Amino acid sequence: MTAIIDIIGREILDSRGNPTVEVDVVLEDGALGRAAVPSGASTGAHEAVELRDGDKARYLGKGVTKAVGAVNGEIFEALSGLDVEQQAQIDQIMIDLDGTPNKSRLGANAILGVSLACAKAAANSLDMPLYRYVGGTSARLLPVPMMNIINGGVHADNPIDFQEFMILPVGASSFAEGLRYGAEVFHTLKSELKKAGHNTNVGDEGGFAPNLPSADAALEFVMNAIGKAGFKAGSDIVIGLDCASTEFFKDGKYVYEGEGKTRSISEQAKYLADLVARYPIVTIEDGMSEDDMDGWKELTDLIGKKCQLVGDDLFVTNVKRLAEGIKAGRANSILIKVNQIGTLTETLAAVEMAHKAGYTSVMSHRSGETEDSTIADLAVATNCGQIKTGSLARSDRTAKYNQLLRIEQQLGKQALYGGKAALKALA
């Protein structure tokens, strides 16, 4: 009854107006699973390959008809008739079929679309929510949202070198309450930026992109908005940064073009330590560049006991890179992006490895998103306790938050909220 009888790939648009892959998996019993694949702007060099057509006459070269062709052709032929509940087997067949170390032949976007659609079809066939199907009966932890309210770096056209300034409502008693905290700060920040004469248009992830000269200036606005919204910074709401520092690491130095400053590896680590000392910053993502291994070790030794240090470009959701990092003592947390690795099975393996080593994990969106809310279910399924899915604007972001509200309601009294315990720096 749960045999795969059809796989249908199609080209759809993401939140930036670029093509991406959507896949439907149809089962013998009539159940259907649908998944759409996200796409990043600041991508790690070690990520699985997103296959684009490269035909400049169509979508400026960003079409995905080759990946869709792989879904409808080779991948369907290899999986037709298989039991959809055999997720690990299905994912391994696709990995072997691709035959490259980084999924570059068929495309991680093709493989991931099928992988996630299979899990959704299986859940629908069993009449189970996806978080329950993937996570079993222990899946009940609602994640703390890391809400990206000020954007800089490659996500914005402003001088701020860091990519994201986030708020985390750790003092809330439930996910729904935490979301309200975030929304109230978001609207307060908007009016404060307006008062100061700043543009309040939103960026790719729904955050504001004001023309501010430095990280300090952005942090002052965030602190002010938290207080003016009636919350206490450091207890109700804490702050997170995504430096995306690979983007401004040049010739062994960190070049802050917006600030007009250049910092050495040691100076970069000390600068971040100074920010942590002056603001209630409890999590920093990609504080060092993806290949600056010495810098990562230095930063971890310096502030790893009091701050969550999240490896995104450093680990790219890859168990091999994560294992190396754990062994060397680099970072203490991993960002989980399903499209960095390209299958559900490998994604779950990365979360499991992190948790076994005492590292935290953060489920994450990409800057190019769709209305697909799979990562909301995966955050609950893995009990990871944290999710990063943008700001409180744009339906491609709120789709994930709204799904988490539904899950929390469905779990009822069983639901737990990550809160301060989700971040080891606060526990």
From Swiss-Prot:
Protein family membership: Belongs to the enolase family.
Alphabetical list of PANTHER family matching this protein: ENOLASE
Alphabetized Gene3D superfamilies for the sequence: Enolase-like C-terminal domain (3.20.20.120), Enolase-like, N-terminal domain (3.30.390.10)
Q: What EC number(s) are associated with this protein in UniProt?
A: 4.2.1.11
Print the keywords alphabetically: Cytoplasm, Glycolysis, Lyase, Magnesium, Metal-binding, Secreted
Residues at which Mg(2+) binds: 242, 285, 312
The protein's job, in short, is: Catalyzes the reversible conversion of 2-phosphoglycerate (2-PG) into phosphoenolpyruvate (PEP). It is essential for the degradation of carbohydrates via glycolysis.
Please name the gene that encodes this protein.
eno
MF terms (GO), sorted A to Z: magnesium ion binding; phosphopyruvate hydratase activity
Cofactor(s) for this protein?
Mg(2+)
Catalytic activities: (2R)-2-phosphoglycerate = phosphoenolpyruvate + H2O
Major localization listed first in the record, in broad terms = cytoplasm
- SMART domains linked to this entry: Enolase_C, Enolase_N
Cofactor, free-text remark = Binds a second Mg(2+) ion via substrate during catalysis.
What is the source species? Bradyrhizobium diazoefficiens (strain JCM 10833 / BCRC 13528 / IAM 13628 / NBRC 14792 / USDA 110)
The pathway where this protein functions is:
Carbohydrate degradation; glycolysis; pyruvate from D-glyceraldehyde 3-phosphate: step 4/5
Q: What is this protein called?
A: Enolase
GO CC, sorted alphabetically, is: cell surface; extracellular region; phosphopyruvate hydratase complex
Question: Quick one: which residues bind (2R)-2-phosphoglycerate?
Answer: 163, 337, 366-367, 388
